[in-house]
Curated annotation (Swiss-Prot):
One Gene Ontology biological process: ribosomal small subunit biogenesis
SUPFAM superfamilies: Alpha-L RNA-binding motif (SSF55174)
Cellular localization per UniProt: Plastid, Chloroplast
Organism: Dendrohypopterygium filiculiforme
Family note: Belongs to the universal ribosomal protein uS4 family.
Keywords, alphabetical: Chloroplast, Plastid, Ribonucleoprotein, Ribosomal protein, RNA-binding, rRNA-binding
Name the UniProt record assigns to this protein: Small ribosomal subunit protein uS4c
Superkingdom of the source species: Eukaryota
Domain S4 RNA-binding positions: 90-152
A Pfam family hit: S4
Primary location: plastid
Keyword Chloroplast attached: yes
A GO term, aspect molecular function: structural constituent of ribosome
GO cellular component, one term: chloroplast
Length: 202
C-alpha cells in the first residue's frame, strides 16, 4: 500500500489530530463515536485499525514500512510498543519536523529528497534514515536551502522542541541528544493496540 496523497482534512476528521500530516485540527463529528460502538466485535477491530492508521498517516509511511518497524520492534529488548514509537520518531524526516524546521513530515521528506539536509556534515537523501544520539542535522550551505528552512523555523520554533532534541538557531543546527521517552511522543496514540492489531493479522 502506497503513501496517502488524498485530502488530509478528511483523515483527521476520522482519526483526530495528526500534527505530522497537517497542522489543521477540525472538529470530529460526534456521530462517528456512536457508529464505532454500534457493534462490539466490529468496534474492537476498528479501534485497533484506527490506532494503526494514526501511525501510518502521522509518520507518512506505507503499510509495508509500518509492518517492518513492528517486526524490528518485536525483536528488540523492552516494550514492543515503545520501541516501535522510538523507531518511528528517530526517522530523519520526523526529527526534522520535531525540530521545527518544517510544518509537516511530508514537508521534511521533501527537503531530504531534494538533498537540502546534512547529517554529521554528509548529505542524506533517505527520509527513513534512522538518527541516533549525537547526530547533528544541518542544512546545505546554499541560499535556496537556507531560505526554505528560515521561512519555517521562525514560525514553528514557538512550539516546544522535545527534550531528546536541541536546536541552535544561530548555527541552524539540530542535535539528537538521546533516544526519546514515551512522554515525548508528539502523537496521541495507543501503541499497544497497534502491536495487537498486527499480532492478530499474523
Amino acid at each position: 500500500m502506497s503513501r496517502y496523497r488524498g485530502p488530509r482534512v478528511k483523515i483527521i476528521r476520522r482519526l483526530g489530530a495528526l500534527p505530522g500530516l497537517t497542522n489543521k485540527t477540525p472538529q470530529l463529528k460526534s456521530n462517528l463515536i456512536n457508529q464505532s460502538t454500534s457493534n462490539k466485535k466490529i468496534s474492537q477491530y476498528r479501534i485497533r485499525l484506527e490506532e494503526k492508521q494514526k501511525l501510518r498517516f502521522h509518520y507518512g509511511i506505507t503499510e509495508r514500512q509500518l509492518l517492518n518497524y513492528v517486526r524490528i520492534a518485536r525483536k528488540a529488548k523492552g516494550s514492543t510498543g515503545e520501541v516501535l514509537l522510538q523507531l518511528l520518531e528517530m526517522r530523519l524526516d520526523n526529527v526534522i519536523f520535531r525540530l521545527g524546521m518544517t510544518p509537516t513530515i511530508p514537508g521534511a521528506r521533501q527537503l531530504v529528497n531534494h538533498r537540502h539536509i546534512l547529517v554529521n556534515d554528509y548529505i542524506v537523501d533517505i527520509p527513513s534514515y534512522r538518527c541516533k544520539p549525537q547526530d547533528f542535522i544541518t542544512i546545505k550551505n546554499q541560499r535556496k536551502s537556507e531560505s526554505i528552512i528560515n521561512k519555517n523555523i521562525n514560525f514553528y520554533q514557538k512550539y516546544k522542541i522535545p527534550n531528546h532534541l536541541t536546536y541552535n538557531s544561530l548555527e541552524k543546527k539540530g542535535l539528537v541528544n538521546q533516544i526519546l521517552d514515551r512522554e515525548s511522543i508528539g502523537l496521541k496514540v495507543n501503541e499497544l493496540l497497534v502491536v495487537e492489531y498486527y499480532s492478530r493479522q499474523a
